[in-house]
Amino acid sequence: MHVAEVAVNVILLLSMGWTSDSLCSPTIFYRDCWIRRFPGLLINLEESQKLGAQFLKYYSESTGQKCSRSCCLRKDVSCNLAVFYHSPIHDNINCLHVHCPTLESCILEPGTSAILYNITDGIDPDLLVFEQSPTYLNTRSSSNRWDRLRILKAMNLDKQTTTINGMLPSTEAPSSTTHQDLVVNTNSTSYSKELTTDFWARFTSLNESITTKINKVSPSTDFISNPDNKTISPFFEPIDTKLSHMPVPPGLNSSKQLLNKTKGYNSRNHTSANEDEVSVTSKTWLVSVALCTSVIFLGCCIVILASGCCGKQQGQYKPGQRKSGSLQIKNRNHMKENSS
């Protein structure tokens, strides 16, 4: 009976251990690293090295947890795979650190006495709960590398779109200059820059269309001059360029060529053309107001003059004289009657 009770207790303890092992999550978080545990797997190091995997370190460690955490703490290289062997092969060496640049570069195979750990950069779950944005992207994980590249491409496209939409020209310079082409003039000739990359080619075509519109309005622009009496556009720096000759109006001074200076705004586009339209509309409004005011003033003057003339004409009549004349006539008639 005693032996049977001991056997039952041992079975219960083993079942509890298996249950707790199955309930434990294979993923843990440690020092900005997500560590995923895969028991029963190991790596074929020779074949993996042929495909681009990099062997980092092979040493002795007490537990698999320490082996995986030491891989996470490596700062010199990106360690994203650790293998812990329960039964060391030789000289008590049981911990292996490997860097896999891609998923296909590391070949896995089953192994009963080994545990494979996949280490990836991550964010503290507490920070995720409090909705704090990450300050870095995942660079350790080979599985998330393509996602990172896609994110970077999307961010670059957004920045390019914002930059192009925000780079509408705002001009501030002396009003005597009207030449607006993006040129660098040395000896009565200007050189326009032609960019080689696709993005800069699109930007150049867009900038040319914008320059054409500005030339129709003919505003003035700022420029930046260097000690060699050359003007340099603030958005173009020396990049593999080709020079093409363009004619320059003879009335312009070669030492005072002006270039477009565009100022980008994230929330709105502000151009000198809009300023000209606003000034034209304001001038038209002022002219109309002045005309209306002058017409009203002239009307008031005419009314005042007319009323004054009417008053003068009415003032020439003398009703008293009429009354006195009629009285004299009556008196004369009365005297004639009396005399008769």
Curated annotation (Swiss-Prot):
Which keywords has UniProt assigned to this entry?
Glycoprotein, Membrane, Signal, Transmembrane, Transmembrane helix
Q: Which sites does the entry annotate for glycosylation? A: 118, 187, 260
One Gene Ontology biological process: epithelium development
User: Could you list the residue ranges that cross the membrane?
Assistant: 285-305
Extracellular compartment: which residues? 25-284
Q: Where is the signal peptide?
A: 1-24
The name this protein goes by in its record: MANSC domain-containing protein 4
Source organism: Homo sapiens
Q: From the UniProt record, report the name of the gene that encodes this protein.
A: MANSC4
